[in-house]
Amino acid sequence: VFARASAWRARTFSALRHPHYRRYWLSQLLSLVGSWMQATAQQYLVLELSGGSSAALGYVTVAQFLPSLLLSLFAGAVIDRVPRRRVLITTQLVLLSTATALAVTTHLGVVSLGLVMVLAFVSGTANAFDMPARQSMVVDFVPRGDVPNAVALNSLSFNVSRTIGQALFGVVAALGVSLLAGGDPDRLSRLALPFYLNVGSFFAVLFVLATLPFPPREIGQHGSVADDVREGLRYVRATPAVRNVMLLVGLLSLTVINFNVIIPYYARVVFGAREAAFGTLSAAFGVGAMAGALWQASKPNPARNLRVGAVILLASAVALAFTPGPALAAPVLAACGFGMLTLLVSANSTVQLTIPDHLRGRVMSLYSFVLVGMGPPGALLASTLIGREGPLGPRWGLVTLSALGGVALLALWGRLPRRITPPAAAADPPGVPAD
């Protein structure tokens, strides 16, 4: 038993053997706790400012993810031309600035829905470059054999931090009542404390990014940015494994992967939850996602679980639609998180291991485009369908979103890859230790 447990541990966390990746992973974990605490506080703030409007939540989500829809392809060409360290430090400084602005305006009581939307748009612009750059840098610090594990551990970090950050939101907001709101639980300034803590969390990852020894990489010859974008698009169109995985991720992101709208609306409006229960329900989703990432971290062939993750995600979303209250919603949301992360880690690893390195920035930006860029239309679709003022209401609106996702899965079922075909002459970059 102990030998099996030890083998599982070594297999599941193999990428953390590499010290540079380990430093980055730990700093990112700390920073993301602050980011998730801010994201949860921002959702709650929007609902408070708008009187519980699902449409307002949808509009802010559109503002946050619209830049990925508009800029992802351009961002990929930039990432393949510019050193990744420079891109990442720049994006982190922009995100630090927007977090500071949100903290100060909320504390002073001058925050407005329009200001939140503007800051969400600026943050989204930074994330349009940050997300594909972070995904691309996985191959800089781990050998090829550990790439699937590193992708899974990145998702684990994302969801451990989601669980901690969302659970801390209720506690920190309660502290904010006494520290920032003069004991008044209805003053919006209580919500500034999560934003201030997020500001502090950026400094760890900035220090690590400034001191990590990024390996040299071949930038190569480039034409115009438009030519580079077209080259990436041609590659995806000509590579069925990558094309079909991206189609599935994009279609599910448009329909059912809209939990940044679904969870806060169900928690605050449908179930009537206050800060503590709101944070608990959000954290339950993160616990399930964390379990999905851990499960995927020990799998040598990530392509096998694309279908499994999608089925679990869709079935649990339907179950959430018929859940009567927050107590039963927590395990259902955990199942949603497990299914979503099983799908997304499988998809990301499959794409990362299939593409050549000279196209990595462009292809991963296209992946970000279909995952995050579908957020704006998906958020509008979700907020329209699940809103109490909408044509279907929360229950049948969510069932409809799940059914649309199910149609997409059935259409692509036979075309999804079952194993990974690596690019020709795949090799580890200079400076990365071999397995």
Please provide the spans of the model-predicted regions.
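C-terminal transmembrane bundle of multi-pass solute transporters/carriers
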Residues: 69-74, 81, 85-97, 101, ...
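Short, membrane-interfacial amphipathic segments enriched in basic
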Residues: 1-16, 216-227
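Helix-loop junctions on the cytosolic side of multi-pass membrane transporters
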Residues: 109, 136, 140, 189-191, ...
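Helix-loop boundary and gating motifs at the non-cytosolic
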Residues: 5-66, 235-285
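Helix-boundary and loop/linker segments of multi-pass membrane transporters
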Residues: 13-19, 106-110, 187, 233-239, ...
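Hydrophobic/aromatic positions within or immediately flanking transmembrane alpha-helices
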Residues: 25, 41, 58-61, 88-89, ...
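Substrate-agnostic recognition of the 12-TM MFS/MFS-like secondary transporter fold
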Residues: 22-40, 61-79, 83-98, 115-174, ...
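Transmembrane alpha-helix termini and helix-breaking/packing motifs in multi-pass membrane transporters
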Residues: 44-50, 103-108, 164-195, 269-270, ...
